[in-house]
Design a protein with these regions (language model features):
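A catalytic-pocket lid/entrance helix-loop region that shapes and gates access to the active site
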Residues: 131-176
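Conserved acidic catalytic loop of the alpha/beta-hydrolase fold
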Residues: 92-110
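Serine-hydrolase catalytic machinery in alpha/beta-hydrolase-like enzymes
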Residues: 73-82, 170-176
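An N-terminal hydrophobic leader/cap segment in hydrolases
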Residues: 1-16
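Catalytic nucleophile-loop/oxyanion-hole region of alpha/beta-hydrolase
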Residues: 79-94, 147-156
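Conserved hydrolase catalytic core segment
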Residues: 108-147
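Conserved HGGG/HGGXW glycine-rich cap/lid loop of the alpha/beta-hydrolase fold
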Residues: 18-78
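Short beta-strand or tight-loop elements
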Residues: 13, 23-25, 108
Length: 176
């Protein structure tokens, strides 16, 4: 199967944004600085952005902002730190972070692309800031309801036991 994504691309800018409450979020921009503004929201929660996610956008047409949400990837505070205070890591905080990033980059309206948990966050952002969303692309949609989380974390193993066991063997006994 051929990879349908765009060629690999490196960021032309990146940084850390202090969003308060002891949190700093890592962000990066890639593509065409004069292109149509777009935001990528990664899944997880807990993961972060990766180079392959830059390839979802045509680099000639889009100016893409990607960021590691609070507690994820290169952002600080990390949720994996023992006894980390996560009280300031809520959906409302993440929505405020997106708005801070939008203002930082001088974007009036942008296309929002979310994957998995990013679809949930993207929908919540669009509800709170509809005037700032030009279009939405939602992939691997989940609303992270209790039933969906149970499906992902337990039930899927009954249907795909071999794949589930392969996945479990790759998960460390204790996270760093």
């Amino acid at each position: 199967m051929q990879d349908a994504r765009f060629p690999e691309i490196e960021p032309y800018d990146s940084g850390m944004l202090d969003v308060g409450d002891g949190h700093q979020v890592y962000w990066e921009c890639c593509g065409n600085p004069a292109g149509k503004p777009a935001l990528y929201l990664h899944g997880g929660p807990g993961s972060g952005v990766s180079p392959g996610q830059r390839r979802f956008f045509d680099p000639d047409a889009y100016r893409v902002v990607l960021f590691d949400q609070r507690g994820c990837g290169r952002s600080r505070l990390l949720a994996s730190v023992p006894r980390a205070d996560l009280s300031a890591n809520t959906t409302a905080h993440l929505i405020a972070d997106i708005e801070a990033l939008r203002r930082l980059h001088g974007v009036e309206r942008w296309t929002v692309l979310g994957m998995s948990w990013g679809t949930t966050l993207g929908l919540a952002y669009a509800q709170a800031h509809a005037r700032q969303v030009d279009a939405m692309v939602l992939a691997l949609v989940t609303t992270t309801s209790r039933r969906e989380v149970q499906w992902i974390t337990r039930d899927v193993g009954r249907i795909f036991p071999r794949e589930w066991n392969r996945f479990l063997t790759a998960v460390p006994d204790t996270l760093p």
